Amino acid sequence: IIGDKANAESEDVSKEEYILSYLGIIEKSEDDEDIQKSITRADFADMLVKALKLGEVNDMQYFDDVDFSHWASGAINALAKAEIVNGNGGGVFEPDEKITYAQALKMLSKPMGYSVYAEANGGFPTGYIKTAVMTKINITLQNSDSLSMGEAIRLLYNAFSTKTYNVSSVKGSDGRNTNQYDVSDDTLFKIYYNLYIDEGTLNSYYGGAMEGASEVESGECIINNEKYSVIFNADIKDFFAENVEFAYIKKSDTQKDIIYIEKQDSGKTTVINSEDLDAFDESAYQIRYYNNNTLRSVSPRRDAEIIYNGNSETSLTLKDIIGGFIDKKYRGYVKLRDIDNDGGYETIVVYGYISLSVSGQSSDGKIIYDEYSSSKSIDTDAYEKVTFKDSNGWEYTDKLKTPSVISYAASTDKKYLEIIVSDKTSDIKISTVIESEYKIRDENGTEINVDESCFNRKKNEIKQSMNISVIYDIFGYICYIGKTEDTIKSGYLAALAAEDSGFDKKVMLKIYTEDGKLEVFNTSGKVKIDGVSYDEGEAAAIYTA
């Protein structure tokens, strides 16, 4: 799911919980156990009052067992005043008893407009359960005698996203009044929050557009030819050319703010990483690739739209693009989409990234230079729409550091440029060099790819047993190699001696290090003992100190 950054970080947050917490109806739970716990009648009353924006009532007590000292008295009184609840008989509400499924349905039926229908179809509890099935707000329960917080959230979401009922009394030919039920176009989400739940295909975003789709500015997207604002800091690219369900708040006819979006499970999708590509058979119009070490193939439609690095491509063929991956010109992926679910792939979305090690920028910051290859340098000013992202897809606003590694995807028409800044680093001790494959193994035997440009320029530092400091690109390739940072070692001084080579004098230290080894170190440059600095040549002074 995608929402604002703080909430989207937890992948376990359901759509229902996210939207209700966004609207302020509930607080997002930090503990899965809280979601599983049974809730009371008071808990559900509190949720419903917040959802309906009723406001608490604290000047009238409606139930004998809910005095003003009860934490939920204001909410329970508000529901009673609105004639949504009438208690369990005898003037009591039983606020601290566990709420049942049927009781929750009865509370929801009045604001939804279904209470008359439910009473006419059996009353409490069967009529309300039948009505829930009819309106499709029903949920699967773990326990029929109680309702968990998670179940209450789903039930409340279903009720608020379902169209309400209008009930009118109509006199028949026999003179009797009968109820007439009409489904309205309104939902409780629309009535109280101007919030809509919709679905469609994401045709355009700031970074790419399908054929015929309008271009948008930063923070916007097009779904089914309607423009929406994306008000959270997240990477909407993952939903490009996908069928999506989304929630938006309508501020005006021209201002619609998406607060939530997710992919729908409709239309077949095949994603192939560039590392798995084997070949492209032009005569069969077939892409061959490996999946779990098994050679497979997929055949898109010959008239399929190809979107390369955001732009509907006309100058490059699918053979050209696949060939570029196989020849290691760039790294990325191919996504084939059957958007209309007719069994054929009519849309092919491709992103091919070139990675470089940043050695610096032009004085105006528009040209980014590569440390190892001048041909990889990129002029951002040559592109119409430029986005910087971090490796998580969030907007990157910091100044580029030197050294650092970026991966960029540029459309052939100079319209779109996406730059992703990698933040993955590590220190490695090389155990094996596989020069023919541009790979190394670390001391744990892990095989690591090295970018070809980096490998060729840093051959002298890519040697067995050497310690290197590296920065990876977003695909796990080493694209920068530097010397490991000097480390601080501590231990016990075992012996001290002065060495006189005839040209200079140095002090040798024999130290038991933290890992239990006895090692000899030479002083170099400045030596500081108890806060006093000495030049390395002052052997006698160091020895005395």
Stretches with model-predicted labels:
Residues 154, 164-227, 231-545:
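Short, flexible, surface-exposed loop segments at domain boundaries
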Residues 40, 100, 148, 299-301, ...:
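Helix N-cap / beta->alpha transition motif
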Residues 1-74, 81-146, 160-236, 245-247, ...:
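Feature responds to low-complexity, polar/acidic, surface-exposed segments characteristic
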Residues 44-48, 75, 101-108, 152-153, ...:
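Amphipathic, non-transmembrane alpha-helical segments in extracytoplasmic/periplasmic proteins
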